């Protein structure tokens, strides 16, 4: 069981209507990941977006900077939008970070729940599924063989070409993030790739059939059962007082849900949704340490995942509040969850 933190680099929205600079948020991110490393948190993931509400469009640059400031923490995308990227270049970038970090780099890829990168990089949304399928196939092949000969529809063919540098130990750990479609789960199992379930709404237990489906598909493709790995990605935020934390964080969280929702036709986000999400059957882990421990243990009992990714900067909370949330997660939440599960801890 591993515990980590993911972020998107949400920009700070100030009460006077101004937005904090990207540079400010990027520098904060590096301080935050340093703290995670010092606390012994297992992994850090940073996402890719091309919108005004997020500071990070190139996760690999943030991870390269983080590699020079950290010693032990695993560094990953969360996620890299593979459909609008070149798998060759993506592998090279993350293999470079892997070399820089002495083997601490992972690559998590997804189709992308935001579509801004498709027109930005010249891809047709009508090819959404086909792009991801072809590019995942190429990425996996690059990770497994060098040199490589390959031909597809959406990029130039490769003819006995070397892809360099190679990752440490000539292998990059690649995860696939899915939003909940059976097809995505089967695809990950077919390629023998570990999978993250992005659970950002509803009742998380509803994902249990997909967990089971993944393991069933994994067995169907005759992979070793011991190698199957699953993770969950869940919105989290921690404070010393549960009620105060919820009350203070709700306006920021709701504002970001509404910024995203305004582009997707969602109705305005309401407090009752937030409160339901914080409850036993909801998909938010927001509150004090006791609430967090209880919720994570319940989710683990129901879903049986190997990794828990606490997504922690939705809405751009203040840097000081994020540092406190990270400290509570690393110093109190993780050790207590591990103890309850009988997992040895060095924290």
Sequence positions of predicted segments:
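Internal, glycine-rich beta/alpha segment that forms the wall or movable "lid"
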Residues: 15, 86-193, 212
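An alpha-helical appendage that flanks or caps ligand/catalytic pockets
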Residues: 5-7, 38, 129-162, 205-305, ...
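N-terminal beta1-alpha1-beta2 module of alpha/beta enzyme domains
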Residues: 1-70, 74
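Conserved, mostly hydrophobic/aromatic
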Residues: 3, 48, 66, 97, ...
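Acidic (Asp/Glu)-rich catalytic clusters
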Residues: 37, 63-71, 94, 98-104, ...
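Glycine-rich, proline-tolerant flexible connector loops at the mouths of alpha/beta enzymes
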Residues: 43-62, 81, 113, 201-202, ...
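Hydrophobic faces of well-ordered beta-strands that scaffold small-molecule active sites
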Residues: 3-5, 44-46, 75-77, 105-109, ...
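Active-site mouth loops of central-metabolism enzymes
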Residues: 13-26, 80-87, 170-180, 280-289
